[in-house]
Every structure is written in structure tokens, then in C-alpha cells.
């Protein structure tokens, strides 16, 4: 998936999801301040997306609906979304990935039906995802650095390297 970087970090009972604001069409920057990270389910869930914007909004709506059916059960809601995404003829064509997190779990959801929980609490998607992921993993064990500092530094590194990622970030956090 091209066009963005979304990073999620879980540390010391807190979780943060951060994403850049660049929207690209081919090789052209269309918008630099898009909000690809938002809160769902009465602000108890944070979700970020990479991929086609219209597809992501469709998935946000579907996830919100699943969360309404299964309140407080993020894993179940995500598995139900992934099932629909994989089986529905229309949804199968959507080109996006999502990171979702609540106070207890972080998940990556893909269009191939995967619902993955990162074993170390760090996940990233999008064109700059591997850069942000590597930087966050390198910074996570440094004493005295906050989860916000790790996330912002990792995103800065990703934006410095990835042409589809910019420095305008949106940060959402859930305290443990």
C-alpha cells in the first residue's frame, strides 16, 4: 500500500497511533493535512488507514458497525470485518489496510482476511511503514523516552525517507 505511514506503539499500558497527512495521486501531492487516524466507538478505539481513501472510509464505517454489534470486543469486531472484507464481492476489491487499537489490544487488518496482533506491541503499515517500524523498534527500549517521543521520531525518520509520507502528523493516544 502506497501513500502514507501509520504507526502504532503499545508501551507501559498506553497505546498511540500516529499517521502522516499526505494524500498523493500518482506522483503528485494532492493534500498535505489529511487525517488518516481517527477515533471510533465512542473514542475507545483508534484506527488508522493506508490505501485508497474512499475504501478506507468504507472500512471505517463497516468497523464502526461491527463495534456497535460487539461493544468492547475489538478482536471479534475486526475478525467479523475481515470475514466480510474477504468474502463480499464488492469489499474484496477495496485497497486499504488498517491498524486499530483499544486499551488492551492492537491489530493490523488486511484485505486478504488477516487480523494480526503484533507480538511486541509495535505495528506499521503503508509505504513508509517499514521505516517507521524499524525506527520505533530501535527506540522502544531507550530509558526516559516517552511513547509520544518514540512515535514522533519514528514518523520523522519515515517522512525523511519515504516520498509518500510527510511530516504533518495526527496523533491519538489511549492511556492505560
UniProtKB/Swiss-Prot annotation:
Enzyme class: hydrolase
One Pfam family recorded for the sequence: Proteasome
This enzyme's EC code(s): 3.4.25.2
Major place of residence: cytoplasm
Subcellular localization, as worded in the UniProt entry: Cytoplasm
Activity: how regulated: Allosterically activated by HslU binding.
Residues bound to Na(+): 159, 162, 165
Alphabetical UniProt keywords: Allosteric enzyme, Cytoplasm, Hydrolase, Metal-binding, Protease, Sodium, Threonine protease
Family according to the record: Belongs to the peptidase T1B family. HslV subfamily.
This protein's name: ATP-dependent protease subunit HslV
GO cellular component annotations of the record: HslUV protease complex; proteasome core complex
Active site (UniProt): 4
Lineage, top ranks: Bacteria, Pseudomonadati, Pseudomonadota, Alphaproteobacteria, Rickettsiales
Top-rank taxon: Bacteria
NCBIfam families recorded: ATP_dep_HslV, PRK05456.1
Chain's role: Protease subunit of a proteasome-like degradation complex believed to be a general protein degrading machinery.
Assembly mode: A double ring-shaped homohexamer of HslV is capped on each side by a ring-shaped HslU homohexamer. The assembly of the HslU/HslV complex is dependent on binding of ATP.
InterPro entries in the record: ATP-dep_Prtase_HsIV_su, Ntn_hydrolases_N, Proteasome_sua/b, Proteasome_suB-type
Amino acid at each position: 500500500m502506497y501513500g502514507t505511514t501509520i504507526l502504532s506503539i503499545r508501551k507501559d499500558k498506553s497505546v498511540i497511533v500516529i499517521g502522516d497527512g499526505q494524500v498523493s495521486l500518482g506522483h503528485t501531492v494532492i493534500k498535505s493535512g489529511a487525517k488518516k487516524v481517527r477515533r471510533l466507538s465512542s473514542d475507545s478505539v483508534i484506527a488508522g488507514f493506508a490505501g485508497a481513501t474512499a475504501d478506507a472510509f468504507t472500512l471505517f464505517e463497516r468497523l464502526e458497525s461491527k463495534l456497535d454489534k460487539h461493544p468492547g470486543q475489538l478482536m471479534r469486531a475486526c475478525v467479523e470485518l475481515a470475514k466480510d472484507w474477504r468474502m463480499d464481492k464488492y469489499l474484496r476489491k477495496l485497497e486499504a489496510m488498517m491498524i486499530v487499537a483499544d486499551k488492551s489490544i492492537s491489530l493490523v487488518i488486511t484485505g486478504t482476511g488477516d487480523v494480526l496482533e503484533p507480538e511486541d506491541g509495535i505495528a506499521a503499515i503503508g509505504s513508509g511503514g517499514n521505516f517507521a517500524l524499524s525506527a520505533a523498534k530501535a527506540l522502544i527500549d531507550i530509558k526516559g523516552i516517552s511513547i509520544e517521543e518514540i512515535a514522533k521520531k519514528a514518523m520523522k525518520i519515515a517522512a525523511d525517507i519515504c516520498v509518500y509520507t510527510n511530516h504533518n502528523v495526527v496523533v491519538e493516544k489511549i492511556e492505560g
